């Protein structure tokens, strides 16, 4: 298995040169007191050491051994417990957590880059941590002060973990039909009864306690999603003094045997009258849980970027060393029997596609992180509201597009290796297996597309999109002549997106099938256009800073040109599919399939 080296140079370029994050942090008072350029750089350096030195060496062995279940207990692979203890001691679980309860309060722009390192180094290990961080976010946003004081400090410290319990055997996307029940008790608690499946980290041996956030319905709850409440259910009950007490009536019935992320325990959880406490308001549980789900959706999107980065690093190293045939223009390595395969056109196409998509995704994730920071910390209400709209618009795109292109990149990386890419020892086949799930969990990518098209575009008449479009057009208007080669095709793609949006909004009023028919291609078209915007911004920064590091910045410009020449044109075929409408999708009766 190849080594992982965090792309710190590229991450610094984004934070400092493209987005000028230090200047943003200094104008947001609550961040200014915690973070500056030097602190951010030190955190990234330490994160690179932790992920490359501690987590990456456990990736292959963790996949080989997998999580093991016996008599209700789960054992993580060898080395995971020790690594998690070191990881937790470093405060990484609470990186963006509320300082009032022991979190570090760092900006999301920094956290998304750390999460990418995590997923690149060891996707299975990362899931135990990111689920805990998401549970903390939901509890901090919606829990009572008593619950926050009792649980958050240990969760931020990594002593206790968190899980998200939504799915049931009969209820996946449609959570309105869940059957898990919550019966009120005289002491203010609830008895939780039901079975949840596909629960990441529902049971493990890494932490002293596991805090489950569980969706359930009260006996008199309204039907459907309007009757869902959210409950906190600890594995071990916690006393008023914070000490662990008796085991709660929640147990792991089994774990799933999966295609990938084998070191991550995916659990069947049985709640047999377990004690739980209400989080937020009665019958408002789905809204509260979406705080965690939206965090997880961005995080899982970043899994796609991380796996793609690891695949790219491995493929580049292999392509430089593997000797096969001669370059089309004649021998390059004259002292060898053949040239390295990196000289061949299609190998270069694959590597450049991986590089352009992965670096574009890294820029997009950092941009979403910036909007999350503005939504949380900006002093001006209008600025916060605009950032919130962009976060709502971009989150489904990030989750689906990062993971779709992440799988594409990992398959390309495997292809660069040829037959060796299909062999376990080289690591590429594990990356393909591990990244595949990212298109499925935390809301399948087609559900993300429906969310984007239905709720985030059509429902508000394209208002959220207009905010994004205005920002892109303002950037283009301020660009100098050197950027024309990037700005011109960017505006062409944006015009296409804007015009298609208007057409879909108009057609959806007459035929509700239009939303579903257009949604996946529309999301991809949006993704490629957003990447074009970010590649244009990276090109602008590279031109400004070129003299400081010509090799790096010239590489950025060359990759940007490849993106605009060879990848962005995909928007035209996607637009044709969107314009085709829903008719061809309904040409067959169900019996004809």
Name these PLM-found stretches.
Residues 2-5, 19, 91, 184, ...:
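Alpha-helix capping/hinge segments and adjacent helical runs
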Residues 1-126, 150, 373, 583-593:
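Amphipathic, small/basic residue-rich leader segments at the start of a protein or domain
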Residues 133-135, 144-147, 444, 452-496:
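A structural-propensity feature for long, helix-poor, extended segments
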Residues 101, 459, 475-593:
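C-terminal amphipathic alpha-helical interaction region
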Residues 189, 193-247:
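A short core secondary-structure module
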Residues 198-200, 237-253, 258, 265-296, ...:
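A glycine-rich, basic-preceded beta-loop-alpha segment at the flavin cofactor/substrate interface
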Residues 80, 131-132, 143-185, 369-388, ...:
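Internal maturation/activation junctions in enzymes
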Residues 32-34, 64-76, 288-299, 313-354, ...:
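Glycine-rich cofactor-pocket loops
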């Amino acid at each position: 298995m190849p080594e992982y080296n965090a792309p710190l140079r590229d991450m610094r370029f984004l934070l400092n040169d493209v987005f000028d994050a230090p200047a943003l942090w200094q104008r947001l008072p609550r961040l200014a007191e915690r973070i500056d350029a030097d602190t951010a750089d030190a955190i990234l350096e330490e994160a690179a050491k932790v992920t490359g030195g501690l987590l990456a060496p456990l990736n292959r062995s963790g996949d080989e051994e997998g999580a093991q279940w016996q008599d209700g207990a789960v054992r993580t692979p060898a080395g995971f417990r020790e690594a998690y203890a070191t990881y937790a001691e470093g405060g990484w679980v609470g990186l963006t957590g509320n300082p009032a309860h022991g979190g570090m309060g760092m900006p999301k722009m920094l956290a998304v880059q750390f999460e990418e390192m995590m997923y690149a180094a060891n996707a299975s290990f990362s899931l135990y941590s990111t689920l805990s961080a998401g549970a903390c976010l939901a509890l901090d946003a919606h829990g009572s002060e008593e619950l926050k004081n009792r649980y958050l400090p240990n969760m931020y410290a990594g002593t206790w973990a968190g899980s998200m319990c939504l799915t049931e055997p009969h209820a996946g996307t449609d959570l309105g039909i869940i059957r898990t029940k919550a019966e009120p008790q005289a002491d203010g608690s609830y008895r939780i009864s039901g079975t949840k499946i596909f629960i990441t980290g529902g049971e493990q041996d890494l932490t002293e306690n596991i805090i489950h956030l569980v969706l359930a319905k009260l006996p008199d709850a309204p039907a459907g999603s309007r009757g869902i409440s959210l409950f906190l259910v600890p594995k071990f009950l916690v006393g008023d003094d914070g000490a662990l007490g008796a085991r709660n009536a929640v147990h792991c019935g089994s774990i799933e045997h999966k295609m990938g992320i084998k070191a991550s325990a995916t659990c069947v959880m049985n709640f047999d009258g377990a004690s739980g406490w209400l989080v937020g308001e009665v019958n408002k549980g789905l809204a509260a849980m979406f705080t965690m789900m939206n965090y997880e959706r961005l995080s899982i999107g970043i899994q796609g970027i991380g796996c793609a980065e690891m695949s790219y690093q491995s493929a580049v190293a292999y392509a430089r060393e593997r000797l096969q045939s001669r370059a089309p223009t004649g021998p390059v390595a004259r002292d060898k029997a053949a040239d390295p395969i990196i000289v061949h056109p299609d190998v270069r196409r694959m590597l450049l596609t991986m590089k352009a998509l992965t670096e574009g995704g890294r820029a997009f994730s950092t941009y979403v992180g910036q909007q999350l920071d503005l939504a949380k910390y900006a002093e001006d209400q209008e600025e916060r509201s605009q950032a919130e709209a962009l976060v709502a618009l971009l989150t489904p795109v990030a989750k689906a597009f990062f993971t779709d292109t992440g799988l594409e990149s990992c398959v390309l990386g495997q292809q660069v290796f040829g037959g060796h890419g299909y062999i376990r020892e080289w690591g590429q086949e594990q990356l393909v297996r591990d990244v595949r799930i990212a298109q499925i969990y935390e809301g399948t990518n087609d559900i993300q597309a429906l969310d984007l098209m239905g709720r985030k575009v059509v429902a508000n008449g394209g208002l959220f999109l207009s905010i994004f479009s205005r920002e892109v057009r303002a950037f283009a208007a301020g660009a100098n002549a050197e950027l024309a080669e990037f700005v011109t095709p960017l505006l062409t793609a944006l015009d296409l997106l804007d015009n298609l949006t208007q057409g879909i909004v108009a057609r959806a009023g007459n035929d509700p099938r239009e939303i579903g028919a257009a949604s996946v291609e529309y999301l991809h078209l949006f993704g490629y256009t957003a990447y074009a915007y970010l590649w244009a911004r990276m090109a602008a920064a590279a031109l400004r800073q070129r003299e400081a590091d010509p090799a790096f910045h010239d590489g950025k410009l060359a990759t940007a040109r490849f993106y605009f020449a060879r990848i962005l044109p995909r928007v035209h075929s996607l637009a044709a599919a969107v314009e085709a409408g829903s008719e061809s999708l309904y040409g067959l009766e169900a019996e004809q399939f």
